[in-house]
């Protein structure tokens, strides 16, 4: 679909691979050594029915926007927040970990995403798919367990002073969490034992320690207790119209 006109520029057979390339400032399909221009610099790929779209060997929910940027093609996954989280939780936390820790991860990741929407707007999208924002692997990394963690916490976010917080987290804090959030102190971040003793510090150490969350879950903490431990005096809110 041409992004500019909203008209279909071509139909592609399912389960077949196609190569899209930049060609004379437009997007073209490469086949048999020939280039077939689609006559536009931005297109949307989406399934005709319920299904997934694929690029570079990975499957994604929603739709893919492909656009020209500085002579190169940029691929953007456009999907709902809850579907996005299904690709974040197993990318950020091992699916084999405790279920309550996975639920805590889902709530933290949802809060982080909403608090940072538009962070990468200068590039034409909201968030990157790596740890500069949050690791995201699309539908290819989903598991039943992590999907259930997302679904059982649908719409739940962390708030402080009636605002959604960017719920920072890292793999491990090395014994104590860090209060310094990139040059500023946030009232809901206080240095606390991270319950990840024996695990080398990995990451910025601000907010929730993922190893610590898993260890607390093993001790019987539920997702809410885990999050209230790492983020002080926060409240939980449920989105009315989650997208």
Predicted feature locations:
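Conserved, single-site charged/polar hotspot
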Residues: 1-243
């Amino acid at each position: 679909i041409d992004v500019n006109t909203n008209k279909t520029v071509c139909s592609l057979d399912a389960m077949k691979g196609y190569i899209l390339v930049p060609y004379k400032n437009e997007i073209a399909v490469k086949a048999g050594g020939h280039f077939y221009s689609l006559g536009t610099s931005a297109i949307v790929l989406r399934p005709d029915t319920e299904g997934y779209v694929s690029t570079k060997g990975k499957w994604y929910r929603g739709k893919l926007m492909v656009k020209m940027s500085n002579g190169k093609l940029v691929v953007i996954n456009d999907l709902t927040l809850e579907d996005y989280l299904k690709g974040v939780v197993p990318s950020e936390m091992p699916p084999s970990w405790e279920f309550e820790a996975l639920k805590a991860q889902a709530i933290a990741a949802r809060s982080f995403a909403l608090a940072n929407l538009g962070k990468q707007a200068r590039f034409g999208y909201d968030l990157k798919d790596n740890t500069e924002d949050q690791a995201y692997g699309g539908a290819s990394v989903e598991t039943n367990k992590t999907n259930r963690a997302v679904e059982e916490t649908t719409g739940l976010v962390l708030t402080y002073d009636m605002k959604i917080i960017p719920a920072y987290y890292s793999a491990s804090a090395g014994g104590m969490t860090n209060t310094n959030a990139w040059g500023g102190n946030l009232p809901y971040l206080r240095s606390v034992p991270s319950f990840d003793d024996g695990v080398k510090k990995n990451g910025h150490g601000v907010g929730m320690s993922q190893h610590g969350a898993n260890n607390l879950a093993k001790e019987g903490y539920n997702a809410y207790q885990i999050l209230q431990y790492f983020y002080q005096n926060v409240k939980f809110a449920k989105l009315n119209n989650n997208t």
